[in-house]
Amino acid sequence: MKKVYLSLSLLSCLLFNGTLFAQDFYQEQRAGWLDIAEATKPTLIETIKKTIGIVSVVKDEKAYQGWKVFPKQPMDSLYTRSMKKQSGVVLDFGEHLTGFVTFKIEDLNRAADAALRLKFTFAEVPAEAALPFDPYHGQLSRAWLQDEIVTVSEVPNTITIPRRVAFRYLKIEVLGSSVYSDFKVSDISVKATTSVKEPAAPLAATTPDLIKKIDQIGLNTLKECMQTVYEDGPKRDRRLWIGDLYLESLANIYSFKNHD
């Protein structure tokens, strides 16, 4: 019995003391690991991408997740008219992108006499642009959902949203503006980033079209996950998980061959 009590006492000390669990066995090596990581961090390739047009998001039971997009208007119709009259407009970049959004704000007819507030919703699929994010009942952090509220106090101005986003469609809503003055937005672009330097070699000409499409989607996905590390996803979690690192590294060896 004494041995049992002694064992229980020792276990209690370990559990409630916490000293053993607080030790960092790799403390001396961590600084060196960070230096190596910084020295081998790849340079990101930046490409400016523009929107291809305004689209309508329409309910369609046969479409993926019940929503489909149709071309609506060219971008000039947004850039030359009042943004207040176009709140809720949805833009299509024509492809999935990962990067940083920049836009210009300008006065229309008279100088702004109040701050402007805009909401940007970044959607990977049409349903995200059509359906509201709130109320949110998911278990993951609400902050992972890609919507940003931007307040502009000075007009004219060029604004870059600091959050990196991954999306294809962009919805812009006007949350607040002066009743006396008007404004317009223009020159919306994305600075897309990736560490991929060269495109992958094309498949053989005899490859079936379906396989070519699957391969292209896979390459686009891999390219956007290849940032300063192999990310598990450019939207979420944006982390270097060991399983994703292994799979993405294998795919890179046989596609982009980006070994820097």
Features from the language model and the residues they span:
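Extracellular/oxidizing-compartment recognition motifs
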Residues: 23-232, 244, 260
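Aromatic-lined, polymer-binding surfaces characteristic
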Residues: 238-245
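Hydrophobic, small-residue-rich membrane helices and short re-entrant helix-turn-helix hairpins
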Residues: 234-236, 248
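Hydrophobic alpha-helical elements and their junctions with loops/disorder across both membrane
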Residues: 14-16, 225, 258
